[in-house]
A protein has these predicted regions:
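A membrane-interface helix-boundary motif in multi-pass transporters
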Residues: 38-54, 247-265
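Helix-to-loop junctions at the C-terminal end of transmembrane segments
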Residues: 152-164, 249-250
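Extracytoplasmic gate region of multi-pass secondary transporters
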Residues: 95-153
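Helix-loop-helix hairpin linking two adjacent transmembrane segments in secondary transporters
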Residues: 25-72
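Flexible cytoplasmic inter-helical loops of multi-pass small-molecule transporters
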Residues: 68-91, 284-285
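Structural signature of the two symmetry-related core transmembrane helices
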Residues: 167-181
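A late C-terminal transmembrane helix in Major Facilitator Superfamily
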Residues: 29, 217-252
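Intracellular juxtamembrane helix-capping segments at the cytosolic ends
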Residues: 1-10, 205-218
């Protein structure tokens, strides 16, 4: 909801606004695991959940009230004074988007990160045992993931505002592709930090591009229904990734072979996107 609102009402600084929006989540991914592990040493996990619930009940209504109290948007389409071009862009409905071949090619790129990253997170014990990294290496590697994700968030926001999401989209999964190469070739514990760090770079790019790209191509009038569709596909992709990784492990695939499968998918999606990159433009009325 937050990213959809920002996508709809911001145009000139949409990238920076989305970066700030995602900053909270990425920061929490860095801080909360360490905090929870510490709290588990002094209290039971049930007490931690009660504590979290109390904080949410107290602070969420208060912060929501004060943050939205003085918000004032004129219209959904007229988000900036200099907005004459925005009004001429065709506003695609969801049914029209589903008939556009570009949507499916973009989705192939957008959905690579969710299923590959989720599969890696869920089966981290399999990866760790295959690489003989020890029980804590991957947990420590999440710090590299979070730090690089946050850094990339801010950088991507400025890049999107300068170059547009459509031009940056083709580069989004390249760090993830290099991550699969690292996972295939290297076994040293340091490679865990490099792999998850590269995943974090793609995650930072994907968080911002995942909202702004649709708005640039299909307009903002129906961005809510379009985002609902893409979010549902993302959730399906994470479930698919978990199932696929599990299936491949069950039939005897090594983590190196899974890395090859993942890398082949990423490479294929980049090639497809390359052939249509010049067509990723909005239609003008």
């Amino acid at each position: 909801t937050a990213t959809t609102t920002i996508t709809r009402y911001f145009t000139k600084s949409r990238g920076k606004a989305l970066s700030i929006c995602w900053f909270g989540l990425s920061t929490a991914e860095f801080i909360l695991p360490v905090l929870i592990v510490y709290l588990l040493t002094i209290t039971a996990w049930q007490n931690i959940w009660i504590f979290i619930s109390i904080i949410i009940l107290i602070f969420l209504p208060l912060t929501s009230f004060f943050l939205i109290k003085k918000l004032d948007f004129d219209t959904r389409e007229q988000v900036d004074i200099d907005n004459s071009e925005i009004k001429e862009i065709k506003q695609w409905k969801r049914i029209e988007v589903l008939k556009d071949y570009r949507f499916y090619i973009i989705c192939m790129t957008m959905l690579a990160m969710p299923w590959i990253a989720t599969g890696s997170f869920v089966y981290q014990s399999f990866i760790s045992s295959s690489k003989e990294w020890g029980p804590y290496v991957i947990a420590q590697s999440f710090m590299a993931y979070s730090i690089l994700s946050v850094i990339t968030l801010f950088i991507s926001g400025f890049l999107i505002d300068k170059f547009s999401s459509r031009k940056l989209l083709i580069y989004m999964n390249i760090p993830l592709l290099f991550g699969t190469i690292v996972l295939y070739y290297f076994d040293a514990p340091l490679s865990s930090f490099v792999f998850f760090g590269l995943v974090g770079v793609t995650n930072g790019l994907a968080n911002v591009l995942g909202s702004s790209t649709w708005a640039e191509i299909y307009g903002v009038k129906y961005i809510g229904s379009i985002k609902a569709l893409t979010t549902a596909l993302m959730v399906f992709s994470t479930a698919f990734g978990t199932a696929l990784f599990g299936f491949l492990i069950d039939i005897g695939f090594s983590i190196e072979q899974i890395a090859v499968v993942s890398g082949a998918y990423i490479f294929g999606s980049i090639i497809l996107l390359y052939f249509v990159k010049n067509k990723l433009k909005p239609q003008y009325l």
